[in-house]
């Protein structure tokens, strides 16, 4: 083996450093420099596309997937027969990028050719079939590379389900089969397909927040949250574990990823917890549990907030606002367990956690100010992409202001995290690295989403839950929780949420709203405007709407309402204050449980 081959092999064996300028002693090859340049340009393309360029969703989403296909092909090698091949990975990634561009160029021609002939079949050329098939294969392969075999298996089953398998299944799972050309068209071009609404969420919102998170990390956000957590919680009983919980909560505001959260805070907090007296397994468990909470922590929420906003048409700012209490409840519950463990094993009151005041100030400038700017814009109703872009610009500006202040006062801590060109490039690369998994999964799940919507199995699944629960909210939640548990064993949080939202949300929303409405009917709490809706129902119990009725009468009245009337009545009968009451009840219970006198 030649010396040149020996020098290249270690670089290819660990390709994570391909998306970082870093401090490597091994010089980068020209291929790596081209790859880095492409990733940086691709990051700026996302900013420009969402702020300056107005193109169709198909165009934007296809280019989005094409670029991340190239990045994923290199960072996540195929490992054919246990070996890596850079040539194969790059070739496959470039072929997928070509296929995505071919779809963009062929869309108008496909529509025109189909309209010019009689019949219902889509007019695909041989290259159309090849490009479409390659995109589906890419969705299967890239999702396998980044998350394992569960999602690829679901994609394969979804395609087979609407192609031929659905007509042979019994009950609510039975559906008519579709011809191959129809399956290909719906998978590629439909709003629920590969380049549909889920891909739009990824290309328009999530990727920009990933880039913003990269800027925060490079500017020293991880160090800041650790230092701040030490100041706030470091000197109480079990303080090291509370530092882990608080730092993970703060890091969750910018990462939304359990893996990234653990990697950035766990290397510090786990040794800290072990040295203060916690068992090693417990320390690792606290860090894992606290880091997982990043999926619940606004404003990013592991892409969940963007998916909710798109599916429900509720403003993103509203979803973020109402998510604060459940997120705090989650971290409060983890802290509650930490408190019990600290008392049980007599962990000390804390350890020496001396921090530098200037480090706290420097971190606050580049963490709190940009994050506050982003939250302000989100609450103002602007698009999430604009809010993230504005926060990036403010972060760069603030870092230079801090550097100037440091130069003037001679404070070294204020000068260390200035966002110069090298740091900006590294921030873009880190954002692109973090965005690979989300982008690949959001696009790939479009195949599953298309099969669910096309076949109508979502309605059948919701009907099945409603029948099994017999209108009981508790049973319905247990069934959905069981489904969530099973999906969570093999799917990332965002993927599991999307599938559950499509399959189970209609049933849960219907049972919850019916429970609240029946309660109001029993006690006669409907106002005249709401009561007028029930006067449209041909039922002997309609006259009792204002005065109250029995449980059986209320259930009979509600079940006799036509579907269209029920859909109109539900939003009128359920006030926001009622839902907020449900949200506030659980935290009060946990606050009560957190008192030592109530658990000992």
Task: Please place each PLM-identified region on the residue numbering.
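Conserved, well-structured core domains of diverse proteins
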Residues: 1-123, 129-133
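Long, contiguous bundles of hydrophobic transmembrane helices that form the permeation core
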Residues: 2-35, 321-434
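Membrane-water interface regions at transmembrane-helix termini and the short interhelical loops
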Residues: 49-53, 75-84, 133-149, 310-317, ...
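Membrane-interfacial loop-to-helix junctions in multi-pass transporters
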Residues: 126-130, 192-205, 231-245, 276-282, ...
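Flexible hinge motifs at transmembrane-helix junctions and intramembrane kinks/re-entrant loops
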Residues: 140-161, 165-176, 197-198, 219-223, ...
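Core transmembrane alpha-helical segments of multi-pass membrane transporters/permeases
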Residues: 141, 146, 156-158, 165, ...
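Hydrophobic transmembrane alpha-helices that form the pore/transport pathway of multi-pass ion
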Residues: 226-294, 300, 304, 313, ...
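Hydrophobic packing positions in regular secondary-structure scaffolds
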Residues: 509, 514-600
